[in-house]
Structure formats: structure tokens, C-alpha cells
Amino acid sequence: RNFPPMHPWCRCHYGVAVADWDEWQDDYYRKHSKLTDDEEAAVKRYISSDSYLINEKLRRQIDLSDDEKKFVADLDSALRKIPHYKGKLSRSLRFLYPEDVESFIKDYFVGNTVTYPEFLSTTFGSTYNPDGQVQIYIVGSKLGCDISKYNNKEKEVLYARDNKFKVLRHSKKNGVHNIYLWEEK
């Protein structure tokens, strides 16, 4: 509380040191910011079936309409403010055709890094779709945003665009691919 003694005419200075400024700033911003109406609307819109359309366009790098660009910008902004979830997450994928499964899993070999250009929906609840041919598990999650407040039924955790994950393990049992991922910052 008290300042340490100083010598007259001394050029010493006093300041606050922050080890990781970016992390501190992100944490401060998240704690002291509420979602705007547009940001909250974007989260709710994502939870609806709009997530499928926007993610498909982002995944395939298809041009977005002006409305979709605003939607993505508002959702990006919202995810910077929403608290992160820490723990285990899962994601279930069901494909119509076996060749689609094979096409999807070709990049999921141990040690490889995969990048998702789209928003990535996961759950901290039980397996979302036990009939999915691909079950993805994210261990030690720290970067996913907990949107369960808006989608409690699915216990959804949403990753921002362009997140990278390292493949830790990939096994196939009873026709189901089990893939374990680790977040890369």
C-alpha cells in the first residue's frame, strides 16, 4: 500500500508488470464485457439451423452474403467475450456415404494438425450422436466458448473459426472412428 522509500532526485520509476499482456487483456475484456444485442442474436442464430449453412460456406470457402458476413462478425465478437470451457469435449459426425467418411478421416493421422475454418460445435454432455461413424474427443479443452447458457439441452461449447488441433490418437472399433484431439494455440 505504501510506496517504498525513494531518494530525492532519483530517476527510479514504479509500474505494474504483466507477464502475458495478451492473455491478461483477453481475460479482462471477457470479464468486463457483456454481449451486445447483435452478438447475442448471432449466438442464438448459430444455435438454430443457420449453423449448418454458414459452416458449410466457411468450410468450402464460398462467398458470404452481406447478412452472413455481419452474422459471422457478430459471432466472432461474441465468442471473444464468452467464458472458455475447461475439460473434455466431444463431437459426433454422421455421414450418408462411406466414401464421405473416408474422405473426412484422411487428415486425421497421429501427429497431424487439422484446422477448422468453420465454427466448431462440441458438447460437454454425453455423446451427441452415438450412431455417428466418427466420434471426436477433445482432451484438455481451454479455448472453446461455453454457450450452454443459450443451448443447455445440447451443453454446447463452440470454437471460433480457424482453430487448430493436433491428432493424438485415431482408432477404429466396430466401424466407428474414435479420434482424440489436443488444442494448439
Language model region names:
Residues R1-E23, D27:
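Acidic, glycine-rich two-metal-ion catalytic cores of nucleic acid-processing enzymes
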Residues R11, D26-K185:
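Mono-ADP-ribosyltransferase
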